[in-house]
Swiss-Prot record:
Gene that specifies this protein: bicA
Keyword set, alphabetical order: Cell inner membrane, Cell membrane, Ion transport, Membrane, Metal-binding, Sodium, Sodium transport, Transmembrane, Transmembrane helix, Transport
Compartments in which it is found: Cell inner membrane
Record topological domains on the Cytoplasmic side: 1-15, 64, 115-126, 191-196, 269-318, 362-371, 415-566
Protein name: Bicarbonate transporter BicA
Source superkingdom: Bacteria
Membrane-crossing residue ranges in chain numbering: 16-36, 43-63, 65-85, 94-114, 127-147, 170-190, 197-217, 248-268, 319-339, 341-361, 372-392, 394-414
SUPFAM superfamilies in alphabetical order: SpoIIaa-like
Function: Low/medium affinity, Na(+)-dependent bicarbonate transporter.
Residues covered by the STAS domain: 436-546
Length: 566
């Protein structure tokens, strides 16, 4: 397997332009997410460079742009807030938080190495929509304090909501005006201009220039980013807290899993735009390496970013070279122009992050979820509430569990209709003319027990119900020829029906056992109780043998009609 991503120079012009355009979009977003996370603008920039570089170089989606994203920032905010509060010093807490980022990267590398990529996006859409919308709401709520010109209160979402009256009573008009103006520019900028220059960059530059002249740094106490240190970052030594180690593992797992989902969903978008197919397992390894190195050098966690990826593709990017160009451009900005960011108002960055939060919310599905599926809508709303008020991992776990239970119930109900007991040819089941003849000759003493389709554990109840409803008989023909897969629970229910029939000294025939179904029954040792001459591949032959076993005199002079379907 090729170690690096797909890189060639046949599309060098498109890749360079795509990378440059993606870098222009990434700059304001990285600054905003760095500040929003609590780690600072510098951490956001280095996260954009390092995650973007290593994910592009070693990932499995050639056009994917990786950087700090809204969902990852929400989790990072909680991680940083917790460990800076619980550690002996804020610096130690920040080191632990960056260690969690490294651990999240290791988790992603493990997920990719175990080839779990294909399972990540098999989550029900109601759950994905719910937790993404919940993350969007969290990001919006967390920006309320800086949006209103004040420092964020502790306690995350709950703390912000509890302090909302205080925040509103101490509103800073100048900073709030800058934040509102930022949102207005991004929201209402004409589409024809958006295609030329990203509205986030326009809002960042205009907001900074206006603030510089209206609120001069020398005389105003307007909150700004402050100077970002030029040069390469220092290595962050991994720091572990024995008391908090369990919390570190859990946070790293959540961050890693969210990064996997975020990246692979964006990879699917990239596939649809480029008509290619990504390598999900390779992508997870690339994302993991990106987050590992980002944490190692004091950057926040990142994942595949939909906006940057789409812009990269639309600008001509087709290989991983575009992602590498983007990372190089951002590196040049950090090393050569870091001082220019010192006067950027925090309110402008809050406005950018606020708009990202609004965009993350799945408005399209929220508006029509109740029309598509009331149960699905309830799952989505439940996941949103749990994400916002409890915990992301709890929200996803509960959402997936409930969605799967409902799906299993629907599948079981559909498959239960394919569990039938037939006593005569008048029953609603397709039989050949010969099979109908033999079933009629059985005079109700021979029953055909037919199963078809995959038999999951939810069908066990239907098998037991049909078996219990059987009338008195002398022979049972179990037809499983149309069962491609049989789960453990369903096979045990079938075993129980066969064992009970044998205990009552009834003749038992098994028809059509093949493939996985046969192997399952062999493991249950059923074929030791049902002799080979009664394990047949032909339903007609099984019915004939069952009838003749009860009425041997019918063997004399019996003529078998043709076998066309009735």
């Amino acid at each position: 397997m090729q170690i690096t991503n797909k890189i060639h120079f046949r599309n060098i012009r498109g890749d360079i332009f795509g990378g440059l355009t993606a870098a222009v979009i990434a700059l304001p977003m990285a600054l905003a997410f760095g500040v929003a996370s609590g780690a600072g603008a510098e951490a956001g920039l280095w996260g954009a460079v390092l995650v973007g570089f290593f994910a592009a170089l070693f990932g499995g989606t050639p056009t994917l742009i990786s950087e700090p994203t809204g969902p990852m920032t929400v989790v990072m905010t909680a991680v940083i807030a917790h460990f800076t509060a619980s550690a002996a010093t804020p610096e130690e807490g920040l080191a632990i938080a960056f260690t969690v980022v490294m651990m999240a990267g290791v988790f992603q590398i493990i997920f990719g190495s175990l080839k779990l990529g294909k399972y990540v996006t098999m989550m029900p859409y109601t759950v994905i929509s719910g937790f993404m919308s919940g993350i969007g709401i969290i990001l919006v709520i967390l920006q309320l304090a800086p949006f209103l010109g004040q420092a964020s209160p502790g306690g995350g979402v709950i703390g912000t909501l509890q302090n909302l009256p205080t925040l509103l009573s101490n509103i800073q008009p100048g900073e709030t005006a800058l934040a509102l103006g930022t949102v207005a520019i991004i929201w209402f900028m004409p589409e024809k201009f958006k295609k030329v220059i990203p509205p986030q960059l326009v809002a960042l530059v205009l907001g900074t220039v206006i603030a510089f002249f209206v609120f001069p740094p020398e005389v105003s106490d307007l909150r700004r980013i402050g100077e970002i240190r030029a040069g390469f970052p220092e290595l962050v030594r991994p720091s572990f807290s024995p008391v908090e180690f369990q919390r570190m593992i859990l946070d790293a797992a959540v961050l890693g899993m969210l990064g996997c989902i975020d990246a692979l969903l964006t990879s699917v978008v990239a596939d649809s735009l480029t008509r290619t197919e990504h390598n999900s397992n390779k992508e997870l390894i690339g994302q993991g390496l990106g987050n590992l190195f980002s944490g190692l050098f004091g950057g926040i966690a990142g994942a595949g970013a939909t906006m940057g990826t789409v812009v990269n593709i639309q600008s001509g990017g087709r290989t991983a070279l575009s992602g590498l160009v983007r990372a190089f451009v951002l590196l040049v900005v950090i090393l050569g122009a870091a001082s220019l960011t010192a006067t950027i108002p925090l309110a402008v960055l809050a406005g950018i992050a606020f708009k990202v939060g609004v965009d993350i919310i799945d408005w399209s599905f929220l508006k029509r979820a109740h029309e598509i599926s009331p149960k699905g809508a309830l799952i989505m709303y439940g996941v949103i509430l749990l994400t916002v008020l409890v915990d992301l991992i709890v929200a996803v776990g509960v959402g997936v569990f409930v969605a799967n239970v409902l799906t299993i119930e629907r599948m079981s109900n559909l498959q239960s209709e394919k569990v039938q007991t037939v006593s005569d040819a008048d029953d609603n089941i397709r039989l050949t003319t010969t099979e109908k003849r033999w079933l009629d000759e059985g005079q109700g003493r021979v029953l055909l027990f037919q199963l078809s389709g995959p038999m999951i554990f939810g069908v066990a109840k239907a098998i037991a119900r049909e078996h219990n409803a059987m009338g008195d008989c002398d022979a049972l023909v179990f037809d499983i020829g149309e069962v491609p897969h049989m789960g453990v629970t369903a096979s045990l229910a079938l075993e129980n029906a066969i064992e009970e029939a044998l205990d009552k000294e009834r003749q038992v025939y098994i028809v059509g056992a093949a493939g996985q179904t046969r192997r399952r029954l062999e493991k249950l040792k059923l074929f030791k109780r049902v002799p080979p001459d009664k394990c047949l591949m032909s339903r007609e032959e099984a019915l004939k043998n069952a009838v003749l076993g009860i009425y041997p005199h019918l063997a004399d002079g019996v003529t078998a009609p043709s076998s066309e379907m009735g």
